[in-house]
């Protein structure tokens, strides 16, 4: 009997938390922080914190507040690869999407068509910001700096010894054909990027979510 009561209480608590999260999303304003999904952050699974970058009627654009993991843009050498074909996009829309979000949360995520310079348009549920989006939402370098979770650092994510800030990928390719752009620890964008196979740069996922559900 006690086990049944405990189970009921847990279900009620989970439902309450879910309602609170849904309400926070529905009331989200640009610049605010919300929680959505869960991911390993160094001490087990923890709610993912997101910064609201944009709000358009019934949907909002979220960017993870912290860099959550460290991954290469593309795992094998291929100078012709763009965001459309890279392994990082496959991981974000596959393993990450399926493990970080519940069925209810996935139902809120809006699949969008992303345009990326010098790359085919893509249909994404989870993605990285493009250089154009970075410039639109973060006009000054100081606002672009980010911390990485303990887990991301443990996976090899690079951080500055001076500031502790991380280097994080964008989905836009750099001038060399075998390189992709990333945001440096100081918020500047290295126009030459780095090798797409580099596994020291971190990942800040972005999602559009329905805020009227």
Feature locations, PLM:
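Sec-dependent N-terminal signal peptides of Gram-positive bacterial secreted proteins and lipoproteins
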Residues: 4-22
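Collagenous Gly-X-Y triple-helix signature in extracellular proteins
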Residues: 23-213
């Amino acid at each position: 009997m006690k086990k049944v009561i405990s189970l009921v209480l847990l279900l009620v608590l989970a439902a309450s938390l879910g309602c609170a999260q849904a309400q926070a999303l529905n009331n989200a304003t640009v610049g605010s922080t919300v929680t959505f999904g869960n991911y390993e952050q160094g001490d087990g699974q923890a709610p993912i914190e997101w910064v609201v970058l944009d709000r358009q009627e019934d949907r909002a654009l979220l960017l993870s507040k912290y860099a959550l993991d460290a991954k290469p843009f593309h795992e094998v050498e291929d100078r012709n690869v763009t965001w459309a074909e890279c392994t990082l996009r496959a991981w974000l829309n596959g393993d990450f999407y399926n493990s970080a979000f519940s069925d209810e949360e996935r139902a809120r995520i809006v699949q969008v068509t992303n345009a990326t310079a010098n790359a085919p348009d893509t249909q994404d549920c989870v993605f990285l910001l493009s250089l154009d989006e970075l410039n639109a939402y973060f006009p000054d370098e100081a606002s672009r700096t980010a911390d990485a979770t303990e887990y991301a650092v443990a996976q090899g994510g690079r951080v500055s010894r001076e500031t502790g800030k991380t280097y994080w990928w964008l989905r836009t390719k750099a001038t060399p054909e075998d390189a992709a752009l990333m945001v440096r620890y100081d918020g500047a964008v290295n126009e030459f990027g780095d090798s797409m196979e580099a596994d020291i740069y971190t990942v800040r996922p972005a999602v559009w979510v329905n805020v009227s559900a």
